[in-house]
């Protein structure tokens, strides 16, 4: 949640922030929020005065008898009714104020490139050589079916469209990828978690999981306040809710494994087929909690770890600095890694990492105490160590052979014990 003091002192900063994010200024009416805040403070002052009067009268009642006492009792009763009425108005104003503050996006980093949408994202780096095939490369779904690695047909029969079974060597690849991530990040001091796949809606809302458009929303559990998590960022982010951490313990570096569930409503088309957009997948998530002055460095650090993993897999990729108009609400700045996917003939997103500064920490009330005694909000960052479904696409398509077989990346062979997947059909 945004600090109301900043809005009071300079509301134009948020107005500009909303425009730069390509959001509707009318939906995020900053002037109205300022009015609500002023009204709340005015009501609070009035309530304080009335309560002071009532307390004074209550003290006087015991000092008087007869008519004077009855008169004071009546005055106290009238004040009580006024206070109750005013308190209700105050509660309504405060509720609307916090609701509107809750919807405001985070302040952009000055370093985030300005732009309207994904077309304005800035490529800042490329790594690896794109392989030239002497045959027409297949896409991952054709390869997966040829090698009996997925079953969408039975997944649809059992659960619904865009659900699937991973099979045979694809299962080994999932666990191998997780082991590669663990062996890469454990020496860096990360603590390992397997998180719940469900979270309370207050935690999901606190993280600010508000994807742009209808294509990635939360599954709700009927008759509960629970939702299936779309990322372990949600459960790792909520881990320290309402806590005050010690400065000397920061940064906290967490690696969380979970299933991820997304409704992906409206996500159709050639490039969304197969494993690219599915309702359920497994993911390892990097999550760091740090001091405000360290978050930019930690952001680059997470990106470096993500790059290290894909370099070990020897998959060509590029890094994008996401523009202001393509950022989600919590992120002040975000980097995406897009791997080369020969089957579609273009790069496709495989990881992202976001610096959410104090946005999530304010919403979840996570603070730290400096050695000097001051208490401040922490900064929180997240990144994809590996998203299995996207990683499998990149592996299948980059390591395919003319006969449809798939080579196993050298970095994964020790975990699997084989060097090649052969067609079974």
UniProtKB/Swiss-Prot annotation:
| Gene Ontology terms for molecular function | ATP binding; serine-tRNA ligase activity; tRNA binding
Give a yes or no for keyword Nucleotide-binding in this entry: yes
User: What name has this protein been given in UniProt?
Assistant: Serine--tRNA ligase
Cysteine pairs forming cystine bridges in this chain are none
Where does the source fall among the domains of life?
Answer: Bacteria
**SUPFAM superfamilies attached to this UniProt entry:** Class II aaRS and biotin synthetases (SSF55681), tRNA-binding arm (SSF46589)
Tell me the keywords, alphabetical order. Answer: Aminoacyl-tRNA synthetase, ATP-binding, Cytoplasm, Ligase, Nucleotide-binding, Protein biosynthesis
């Amino acid at each position: 949640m945004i600090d109301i003091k900043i809005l009071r002192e300079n509301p134009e900063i948020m107005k500009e922030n909303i425009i730069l994010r390509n959001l509707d200024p009318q939906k995020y009416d900053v002037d109205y929020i300022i009015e609500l805040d002023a009204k709340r403070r005015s009501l609070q002052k009035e309530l304080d005065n009335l309560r002071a009067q009532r307390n004074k009268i209550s003290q006087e009642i015991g000092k008087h008898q007869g008519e004077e006492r009855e008169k004071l009792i009546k005055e106290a009763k009238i004040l009580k009714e006024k206070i109750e009425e005013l308190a209700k108005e105050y509660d309504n104003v405060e509720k609307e104020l916090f609701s509107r503050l809750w919807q405001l996006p985070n302040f952009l980093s000055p370093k985030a490139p300005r732009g309207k949408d994904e077309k304005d994202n800035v490529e800042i780096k490329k790594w690896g050589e794109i392989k030239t095939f002497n045959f027409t490369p297949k896409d991952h779904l054709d390869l997966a079916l040829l090698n009996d690695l997925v079953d969408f047909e039975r997944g649809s029969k059992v659960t619904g469209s865009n659900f699937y079974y991973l099979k045979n060597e694809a299962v080994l690849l999932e666990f191998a990828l997780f082991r590669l991530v663990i062996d890469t990040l454990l020496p860096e001091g990360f603590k390992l978690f397997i998180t719940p796949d469900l979270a309370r809606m207050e935690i999901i809302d606190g993280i600010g999981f508000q994807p742009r458009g209808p294509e990635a929303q939360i599954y709700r559990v009927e008759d509960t306040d629970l939702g299936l998590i779309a990322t372990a960022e949600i459960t790792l982010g909520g881990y320290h809710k309402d806590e005050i951490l010690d400065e000397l313990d920061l940064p906290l570096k967490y690696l969380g494994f979970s299933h991820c569930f997304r409704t992906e409503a409206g996500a159709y088309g050639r490039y969304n087929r197969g494993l690219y957009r599915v309702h359920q997948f497994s993911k390892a998530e990097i999550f760091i909690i740090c001091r405000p002055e360290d978050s930019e460095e930690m952001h680059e650090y997470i990106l470096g770890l993500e790059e290290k993993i894909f370099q070990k897999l020897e998959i060509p990729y590029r890094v994008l600095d996401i523009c202001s108009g393509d950022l989600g609400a919590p992120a002040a700045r975000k980097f995406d890694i897009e791997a080369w996917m020969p089957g579609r003939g273009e790069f496709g997103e495989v990881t992202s990492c976001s610096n959410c500064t104090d946005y999530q920490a304010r919403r979840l009330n996570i603070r730290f105490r400096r050695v000097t005694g001051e208490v401040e909000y922490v900064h929180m960052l997240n990144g994809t160590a590996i998203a299995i479904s996207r990683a499998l696409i990149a592996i299948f398509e980059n390591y395919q052979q003319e006969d449809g077989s798939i080579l196993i990346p050298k970095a994964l062979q020790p975990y699997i014990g084989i060097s090649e997947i052969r067609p079974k059909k």
